[in-house]
Swiss-Prot record:
Membrane-crossing residue ranges in chain numbering: 9-27
Membrane topology field: Single-pass membrane protein
Annotated localization: Cellular thylakoid membrane
Predominant subcellular localization, coarse grouping: membrane
Identification of the protein by name: Cytochrome b6-f complex subunit 7
Quaternary structure and interacting proteins, as annotated: The 4 large subunits of the cytochrome b6-f complex are cytochrome b6, subunit IV (17 kDa polypeptide, PetD), cytochrome f and the Rieske protein, while the 4 small subunits are PetG, PetL, PetM and PetN. The complex functions as a dimer.
Molecular-function GO terms, alphabetical: electron transfer activity
GO CC terms: cytochrome b6f complex; plasma membrane-derived thylakoid membrane
Summary of the function given for this chain in its UniProt record: Component of the cytochrome b6-f complex, which mediates electron transfer between photosystem II (PSII) and photosystem I (PSI), cyclic electron flow around PSI, and state transitions.
Superkingdom, taxonomy of origin: Bacteria
Signal peptide: none
Record keyword Transport present: yes
Amino acid sequence: MASEIFGIAVVFWVLIPVGLAGGALLLKLQGD
């Protein structure tokens, strides 16, 4: 059970920065 929680935490720690970086990149591309 602990491994499942750890896995979910890792997924969030990876997806959140990637999502923020992707959103910033899209805004920068739209700005141009």
